Amino acid sequence: MATTPLPNALSAYRLLLRATRIAFQGDFTTLHAARAEARKHFDQNRRLGVDTPKHIQHAVETAEILRTNVVQGVRVEGSGEAGKEEQRYELRIHEHIERGDNDTIKTAGNKGIKAAVGKTCSQS
């Protein structure tokens, strides 16, 4: 089984910066904080060591999670019915967000469970 080779540290750092730009586009405060955190971790591990490949792999996996799983919401000002203020949020879903159906989640919990239709718990 072939595995993909790990990028070098600079490539992983650039990959992480691109992922933060995609995930936090339009939110300068969070973008700046995420990039500062990435910089801090890369500076702490500037020297090559035994665990360098592990740190690079962590950066690559973090970038993948940021790019495919982080969705930001922005509060939308709007009036509810009869003067009640309603809290509404607009999600920024970009083309890199992982989309899928819930079929695997719905069927995952049903493995090995037999339910009798029409019976209550006390009748089983």
UniProtKB/Swiss-Prot annotation:
UniProtKB keywords: Chaperone, Mitochondrion, Transit peptide
Record PANTHER family: COMPLEX III ASSEMBLY FACTOR LYRM7 (PTHR46749:SF1)
Name listed for the protein in its UniProt record: Mitochondrial zinc maintenance protein 1, mitochondrial
Organism: Paracoccidioides brasiliensis (strain Pb18)
One GO CC term, this protein: mitochondrial matrix
Gene Ontology molecular function terms on file: protein folding chaperone
Family of this protein: Belongs to the complex I LYR family. MZM1 subfamily.
Annotated localization: Mitochondrion matrix
Signal sequence annotation: none
Subunit structure: Interacts with RIP1.
Gene that this sequence comes from: MZM1
GO BP: any one term: mitochondrial respiratory chain complex III assembly
Protein role: Assembly factor required for Rieske Fe-S protein RIP1 incorporation into the cytochrome b-c1 (CIII) complex. Functions as a chaperone, binding to this subunit within the mitochondrial matrix and stabilizing it prior to its translocation and insertion into the late CIII dimeric intermediate within the mitochondrial inner membrane. Modulates the mitochondrial matrix zinc pool.
Annotated Pfam families: Complex1_LYR
